[in-house]
Swiss-Prot record:
PANTHER family referenced in this protein's UniProt entry, alphabetically: D-XYLONATE DEHYDRATASE, D-XYLONATE DEHYDRATASE YAGF-RELATED
Protein name: Dihydroxy-acid dehydratase
Catalytic function, reaction form: (2R)-2,3-dihydroxy-3-methylbutanoate = 3-methyl-2-oxobutanoate + H2O; (2R,3R)-2,3-dihydroxy-3-methylpentanoate = (S)-3-methyl-2-oxopentanoate + H2O
Keywords attached to this entry: 2Fe-2S, Amino-acid biosynthesis, Branched-chain amino acid biosynthesis, Iron, Iron-sulfur, Lyase, Magnesium, Metal-binding
E.C. number: 4.2.1.9
Biological or metabolic pathway of the protein: Amino-acid biosynthesis; L-isoleucine biosynthesis; L-isoleucine from 2-oxobutanoate: step 3/4; Amino-acid biosynthesis; L-valine biosynthesis; L-valine from pyruvate: step 3/4
Length: 616
């Protein structure tokens, strides 16, 4: 029988000093016999996805106490990728994931907490906390802040839905008036919550459902809706229940590594492919699997992407549907149920809330359930009022979206495409693979051949696009932006948004060893591995080289003879200490970022740390 970790600091005469300090935090005598549950909150006023989380940790804490536990809350940092986008701030986004994981590990381990509730929401916070939870392997429940309502603007009597990307594209489009651009800007992000499309934050919160570590509805229930409050209350009760099952009944099935096993990672990736999730999820799932000691690799992602159809299409892949529409159609449980009917997921994986995922689907699938509470839960609708307050409205859709032929979520026979929403491409320019969000690629450019335009920083590429130096048929190459070369593996939302604003969204491609925002659409290929800074062939591409992209056949090819590439590689190596470094790039790299670069690995491995690179 495992011993409560907390008793290291709460039991025994030699721990009198520690108990004195615990008492100073408000603990009473009988509290020393209870499990201590850490609450990792990520409230910050910098991020709309987190601005409403301030009191939610204490909401969970009171529920933990009522269930018989002791709750202790702490905070992590949270970077807003949208605000950090397009300048040097983006260098810090991906590194913050590891910092968050470490912070959670430090707090939980230093204070010997028995279990953990993770209150996350946005891009790097959910992955960072997920990595920490799998590293610690103590009972955990995830509950996120929830999606933002979609923006809405009335143009000439017609209502249009908006999101953050619309504001970026409109601002760079010379055909959009200042008044129109300002109207879009003011309407694009109307409430608290993670950005309203299937961007990275919402993708990751959906994946925690598929992994079995969060409650049904976690990925899709709006931040503003009263129905989301119950998820926080349930999380408080549930964490005490599973904590006691582990420590008092020796039930290891509730531990995160027992739940997030290889099959669960396959389920999560199948969901990701089916809903056309952010390409960043590939990076984060690989990193999470590494922490869980699960042998889940790019080869598995490639295999799954070839066999799972795209049955849900959401912004930025379409302007018609946002997360509020996914919820109305049954949320993550509905997507997984359609995959289950197609025999494409494992129903026998455990979850924190149900013995198996299959049993959870039987209850929460709106197409088959007789539970009226479940049906009402998925009718939770946007309130249409600008607010930063959680649970502030209780609007309901008049009905559910159960149209599996032409609705937001479809069955396999009526899929948006029988090919999945994400794909791994291989070729001489990316021997270890690269990633494209096929759900956002127009059918007309699934096969594309173009000439390379070389940029060794995102800033230079943006300047060229805005100066109309990029033409139809060009493939914009942005290199030395990988985990080590950036460092920090910047997102490329501005270049792709500006290509769209210039009318080149279906006429150009972009290839980078950096990554893309979940808000990116178009023929945008990221994570090229090995990256240029590690000697990857993307560092050998020259201006006007021809590159052939074939998504249906999962290939990307630099049309340069092997002997020419070998000559270029030799010339690069001859540069000595300047080899595999950008030419004439002016960029300040802080000590913190240099430390990150020294330990980081390839995107093909999730950009996880490998301390052996600096150990002597």
């Amino acid at each position: 029988m495992p011993q409560y970790r907390s008793r290291t600091s709460t039991h025994g005469r030699n721990m009198a000093g520690a108990r004195a300090l615990w008492r100073a935090t408000g603990m009473k005598e009988d509290d020393f016999q209870k499990p201590i549950i850490a609450i990792a909150n990520s409230f910050t006023q910098f991020v709309p996805g987190h601005v409403h989380l301030k009191d939610l940790g204490q909401l969970v804490a009171r529920e933990i106490e009522r269930a018989g536990g002791v709750a202790k809350e702490f905070n992590t940092i949270a970077v807003d990728d949208g605000i950090a986008m397009g300048h040097s701030g983006m260098l810090y986004s991906l590194p913050s994931r590891d910092l968050i994981a470490d912070a959670v590990e430090y707090m939980v381990s230093a204070h010997c907490a028995d279990a953990l509730v993770c209150i996350s929401n946005c891009d790097k916070i959910t992955p960072g906390m997920l990595m920490a939870a799998l590293r610690l392997n103590i009972p955990v429940v995830f509950v996120s802040g929830g999606p933002m309502e979609a923006g809405k603007v009335n143009w000439q009597g017609n209502m249009h839905k908006l999101d953050l990307v619309d504001a970026m594209v409109a601002a760079a489009d010379s055909n959009v008036s200042d008044a129109e651009s300002e109207a879009i800007e003011r309407s694009a992000c109307p409430t608290c919550g993670s950005c309203s499309g299937m961007f990275t934050a919402n993708s990751m919160n959906c994946l925690t459902e598929a992994l079995g570590l969060s409650l049904p509805g976690n990925g899709s229930t709006l931040a503003t809706h009263a129905a989301r409050k119950e998820l926080f209350l349930k999380a408080g009760r549930l964490i005490v229940e599973i904590t006691k099952r582990y420590y008092e009944q020796d039930d290891e099935s509730v531990l995160p590594r027992s739940i997030a096993n290889f099959k669960a990672f396959e389920n999560a990736m199948s969901l990701d492919v089916a809903m056309g999730g952010s390409t960043n999820t590939v990076l984060h799932l690989l990193a999470a699997a590494h922490e869980a000691e699960v042998d889940f690799t790019m080869a598995d992602i490639d295999r799954i992407s070839r066999g799972v159809p795209c049955i849900c299409k959401v912004a930025p892949a379409t302007a018609k549907y946002h997360m509020e529409d996914v919820h109305r159609a049954g949320g993550v449980m509905a997507i997984l149920s359609e995959l289950s009917r197609a025999g494409l997921i494992h129903r026998d994986t455990p979850t924190v809330h149900s013995p198996t995922l299959g049993e959870a689907l039987d209850k929460w699938d709106i197409m088959t359930t007789n539970d009226e509470d479940v049906k009402k839960f998925y009718r939770a609708a946007p309130g249409g009022i600008s607010t930063t307050i959680a649970f502030s409205q209780s609007m309901l859709w008049p009905d559910l979206d159960t149209d599996r032929k032409e609705g937001c979520i479809r069955d396999k026979d009526h899929a948006y495409s029988q090919d999945g929403g994400l794909a791994v491409l291989y070729g001489n320019i990316a021997l270890d693979g690269c990633i494209v969000k096929t759900a956002g690629v127009d059918d007309s450019i699934l096969k594309f051949t173009g000439r390379a335009r070389i940029f060794e920083s995102q800033d230079d590429a943006v300047a060229a696009i805005l100066a109309d130096k990029i033409e139809a048929g060009d493939i914009v190459i942005i290199r030395y932006e990988g985990p080590r070369g950036g460092p920090g593996m910047q997102e490329m939302l501005y270049p792709t948004s500006y290509l769209k604003s210039k009318g080149l969204g279906k006429a150009c491609a972009l290839l980078t060893d950096g990554r893309f925002s979940g808000g990116t659409s178009g023929l945008s290929i990221g994570h090229a591995s090995p990256e240029a800074a590690e000697g990857g062939a993307i560092g050998l591409v020259e201006e006007n080289d021809i590159i052939e992209i074939d998504i249906p056949n999962r290939t990307i090819h630099l049309a340069v003879k092997d002997e020419v590439l070998a000559h270029r590689r030799a010339a690069m190596e001859a540069r000595g200490k300047d080899a595999w470094k950008p030419v004439n790039r002016q960029r300040h790299i802080s000590v913190a970022l240099r430390a990150y670069a020294a330990m980081s690995t390839s995107a093909a491995k999730g950009a996880v740390r490998d301390v052996s690179q600096i150990e002597k």
